[in-house]
Design a protein with these regions (language model features):
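C-terminal motif of bacterial Sec signal peptides marking the signal peptidase cleavage site
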Residues: 15-18
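Bacterial N-terminal signal peptides that target proteins for export
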Residues: 1-9
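Ser/Thr-rich, low-complexity intrinsically disordered terminal regions
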Residues: 20-139
Length: 139
């Protein structure tokens, strides 16, 4: 009986102390989330949500993505690229103040979130070009 009681106390203590997170780990997680968000977001100087959504869709298609869903009211576009592996991206467009649109892209390769800044940079470079050409009415 005493052996079981001791074993339960030891297991309970191990579980309790094993779940405690340090302040450093919490801060590290928050910092990496902020850093990841900086890769994933860009603000554009336009108040036209529909045109921004059209540019996002055109950019994804130019990058060989196949559209899964697009919802103007929600400001969400989902697309998939199949080239040896599955890359899924979800882009949200929302107003930022009265004169800007905030575009955020989230990508997943297979089941893992893409944390490398390069794919996001490539997407936003292509989107910036598309937005520029659209603003200057160049086809």
């Amino acid at each position: 009986m005493r052996v079981r009681y001791r074993l339960l106390v030891i297991l309970g203590a191990a579980l309790m102390f094993g779940c405690v997170s340090s302040v450093d780990q919490v801060m590290k997680t928050d910092q990496s989330a902020v850093q990841l968000r900086s890769y994933q977001e860009r603000a554009f100087d336009t108040a036209d949500k529909e045109q921004t959504m059209r540019s996002v869709i055109a950019t994804l298609q130019d990058l060989s993505f196949v559209l899964d869903k697009a919802d103007l009211d929600l400001g969400v576009v989902s697309a998939t690229k199949l080239s040896g592996f599955q890359l899924r991206v979800t882009v949200t467009v929302r107003p930022r103040g009265s004169s800007q649109m905030l575009v955020r892209a989230n990508a997943q390769q297979e089941e893992t979130a893409v944390e490398d800044p390069k794919p996001y940079q490539d997407f936003f470079i292509a989107l910036e070009k598309s937005m520029f050409l659209t603003a200057h009415e160049v086809d």
